[in-house]
Regions:
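Fungal secretory targeting signals
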Residues: 1-23
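A generic structural micro-environment signature
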Residues: 7, 42-45, 62, 92, ...
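A generic structural signal for short, solvent-exposed coil/turn residues
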Residues: 10-12, 28, 46, 58, ...
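Extracellular structured ligand-interaction cores
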Residues: 13, 49-51, 105
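Short amphipathic alpha-helical surface micro-motifs
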Residues: 17-21, 33-37, 47-49, 88-91, ...
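Short, surface-exposed binding/anchoring microloops in extracellular/periplasmic proteins
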Residues: 23-74
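Acidic, low-complexity intrinsically disordered segments
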Residues: 75-147
Length: 147
């Protein structure tokens, strides 16, 4: 009796572990990288609004110029902002201090509605300080959005 219970337990466990693994799908788009050109953020001295200006170059030879405004108290450190439409693109953003307040950064979400692709360019507070153009330009591989 003890033997048959042990054999049954082993056989039951073996059947569970032999189940096939779920497949995964690579969501990275098989397209050229997108480059954010001449990114610049200017914030008012009272930090009530920050104006972004940048070009989105999807590899077609002509960057699409975008302006994006983040409004409200503490605009430079707003945890969630947007959406804003810029031609075919929808822009949102979020600020994080997960590496400490002195290492804050803003991540943009740039979505192409027609291509159903997204990139997440990120800029540290230090890169954006003084409303200077960020150089070098930064490039990102787009991900495909699920259908």
């Amino acid at each position: 009796m003890k033997f048959s219970a042990a054999v049954f337990a082993v056989l039951a466990a073996t059947g569970v572990s032999a189940a096939p693994a779920a497949e995964s799908v690579n969501m990275m788009a098989a397209t050229p990288q997108w480059t954010i050109r001449d990114a610049k953020r200017y914030c008012r001295s009272d930090d009530s609004i920050c104006n972004w200006k940048f070009g989105i170059d999807t590899g077609n030879g002509k960057p699409y110029e975008c302006r994006y405004d983040v409004k409200g108290p503490g605009a430079s450190k707003k945890r969630s902002a947007g959406p804003s439409t810029c031609g075919d693109f929808t822009i949102t953003s979020g600020w994080s201090d997960q590496f400490g307040a002195d290492n804050g950064f803003t991540t943009l979400s740039v979505v192409s509605k027609s291509k159903r692709q997204i990139i997440w360019p990120a800029y540290t507070d230090k890169q954006l300080a003084g409303a200077k153009i960020v150089k070098p330009d930064q490039s990102y591989t787009p991900a495909s959005l699920p259908k």
